[in-house]
Amino acid sequence: AIRQGKFPKGTKETLLKQAHSKNPTTRFLATLQLAGQNHEGMPAVLASVLAANSHDRWTRAAVFSAAENAATDLLDQLATNPQQAQADTLKSLGRIIGKGRPQQELLSILQRHFGAKTPWPIASQIALLTGLADGVHGRNFSGTGKTTILMLPKGQPEALANTDGIFIAARKSARDK
């Protein structure tokens, strides 16, 4: 029945509990069913699912589907325990945020999640910025033409400094390898 998309019916509370299960299949199915539901604790639940199984691309897809418009909240939740977030997870989440969130929200992310005060290690910041750059590429904010991640923080000194710092760190990291 599950292969046809027919899941056992469960309450939101049951699904949130199942998302914390030790069984990866139970976690995955609960996460899939959480898509389209709103709950204030959803970002924390989704972050815990990612922490338990972020290496699995299907789990990541289920989490990102369930996050929908709460992708920025999910990123904020992941930042509370930054060592658990995998680079590929941050890159994918950054791409989703870059494609769908408004310009002001993206600028806020550049200010809060990058630079010296961020909880993320530099490799995570590079992965997140790469994803944001992929997502933002070609978007048209306020009729300004197609945007790149380099153009987004113009006129925002803190966001610009944070972005520049990540590019410098990425170049240094590439040279050191």
Description of each model-found segment:
Residues 1-177:
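Long, ordered, helix-rich scaffold segments
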